[in-house]
Amino acid sequence: DSDIEGQPAHAGNAPQLGHNALMAACAASMMLQGIPRNGDGATRVSVGTMHAGEGRNVIPAHARLQMEVRGETEEVNGYMRDYVYDIFAGVDKAYRVKSTLTKAGESTTLLQSPALFDKVEDVMRHVPNTTLLPRIHAPSGSEDCALFIRRVIQHGGQAAFILWGCNHHGHHRQNFDIQDERS
């Protein structure tokens, strides 16, 4: 996430005295979307919220972005993270503002224990009304599970990630429902 501090000024009487945090946040948002993708793995960028401004006739002195970048591997995630820092350094200079970046979370490569794959499939074959689909070798999303699984493996345990399919209309939507009618 980013907190951007500018300099307020009266938009009509002395706009030259202001350093517009809102415009800096807008510029950063557009540049984040333009980070070049990486041939070593999939990448994602999301600016989810922007809050800025104090009034219609005031050069905005404060802006806050809630955002994230993701990379398929830790190396690609680092590539994305480095771009974020470079973008905000440039925005700070161009708009004469001060950005403070805060890591609010992260994702990591989803490591699994291949020794569990056959065991999990054997158990799933005995679950009524379940159809096994081909294995997904590089599942995406579920950053919380990726972090949990990594910690289990680091402590000598084994873990596997299971996707339980359902007929829904997309994640993170207001009408999200896994349509589980039997549990």
Which residues are covered by each model-predicted region?
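An extended, acidic, His-containing surface patch that forms the Zn2+-binding/catalytic region
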Residues: 104-183
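Midchain, well-structured core segments that form catalytic/ion-binding scaffolds
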Residues: 1-111
